[in-house]
Amino acid sequence: MPSNSRKLHWEEVYQTKPLETVGWYQPKPETSLSLISRLELSFDAAIIDVGGGDSLLTDHLLNLGFKDLSVLDISGAALRRAKTRLGIRSGEVHWLESDILDFEPVRSYELWHDRATFHFLTHPAQIKKYLEIARKAIPHDGFLILGAFSDKGPPTCSGLPVQRYSILELQRVLAPHFDLIHGLNLDHITPSGSVQAYTFGLFQ
């Protein structure tokens, strides 16, 4: 799917579906917060949430005391929703409206977090470009947290095909650039009650 088509798709999603109804909704992103906690990052650490949209991860990280947060999303509507929800605290966050494949990092991030953006990249050239961008943005002592549908997960998400990964497959794809520190599988229960099987990896 071309970049402009991807943008139109996600703008429609965020303009028509309330946060609490989308399949990826989490009132508290427990897995991401647990993985971040084990890193013992400084509160001044630069963290970027790729494809973060209006996820509540940013709210929780702000509440924990993190001061250098960036949220990147292809959808301006998603970012506006997040800003509205955060109110005055939205000024504490760097908001980046961009397709991840068009993103040109101008700084480095000690943590790159991505829950369910990477798995929408289904062509080798897209995956290669994503990893090149991430490698440019993450210093050698930095970390990457990646969540994607597992090999037991559904073949589509929000009406789009996804690339599913076991822990070993995710490790293999990222191996040229990153080393796996910890991997896990888990089930996410959507607001409608369906189960989505995820693979998460913590890399450096």
Can you say where each PLM-predicted feature lies in the sequence?
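Short catalytic micro-motifs in class I SAM-dependent methyltransferases
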Residues: 116-120
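A conserved beta-strand element that flanks and buttresses the S-adenosyl-L-methionine
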Residues: 113
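Conserved acidic residues
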Residues: 110
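Class I (Rossmann-like) S-adenosyl-L-methionine-dependent methyltransferase catalytic domain
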Residues: 1-107, 121-137, 142-204
